[in-house]
Amino acid sequence: MKFPNKKYINLESFYNDYFKNLNLSLSSINLSNLKKIIKILNEIYTNDKNKLIVCGNGGSAALSDHFACDHQKILYETKKFKPFVVSLVSNFSLGTAISNDVNYRSIFTEQLKQISKNKDVLLVISSSGNSENIVNALKWANKNKMITISFTGFDGGIAKKIAKINLHIESENYGIIEANHQSLINIISQYLKLRVLSNKQIKKIKF
């Protein structure tokens, strides 16, 4: 859905339409795929064998770091999970070295070659789904027997098509797409946490 598609004469109208579109786009999420992702992450966060690797560009790079931070800290605190989550954008020095010595298209693929193994999970966050480094990472991960997941927006691009599981935001607005991707990160971590806590514990802690 295209938003905005007109000029607004006051903040109130834009505010109301923004949140209307935000909620509409979140309601378009494929809940069956979300359940699959939660099941996969629950398994790797408890098996002590595999890791989650996350990546993105620009605002999605920030979401990648946020994903790693929240899932490692929030879920480990329950003592029920041992999440091993790596954001491929966290090591700025390594990223610039690969970009300079190889190329930016390979910034994620080169790191995957070094740290990934079979049945690790690659989760890419990309509004367009067409960033070349994201697409290359997905192709390499699929070829090397990783589990691949994509968070996308707009028309989903290539990442929507080639990831084994996709969560797509029906929107053509970067802000709305990225806000909903952040919501998905929170939903996944908080739901996993809720599943292992008692009602008494839930009432005592902050989410």
Task: For the regions a language model picked out, list residue spans one by one.
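A charged, well-structured terminal subsegment
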Residues: 114-115, 122, 175-207
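Generic N-terminal amphipathic, Lys/Arg-enriched alpha-helix
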Residues: 1-29
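Glycine-rich, small/polar surface segments that engage phosphate groups of diverse ligands
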Residues: 43-115
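Glycine-centered short loops/turns at secondary-structure junctions
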Residues: 48-49, 119, 145
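Short, well-ordered beta-strand core segments
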Residues: 122, 148, 166-168
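A short, well-structured juxtamembrane/interface segment
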Residues: 29-46
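Short, glycine/polar-rich helix-capping loops at beta-to-alpha or helix-loop-helix junctions
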Residues: 150-163
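Short glycine/serine/threonine-rich phosphate/pyrophosphate-binding segments
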Residues: 60-65, 130-137, 159
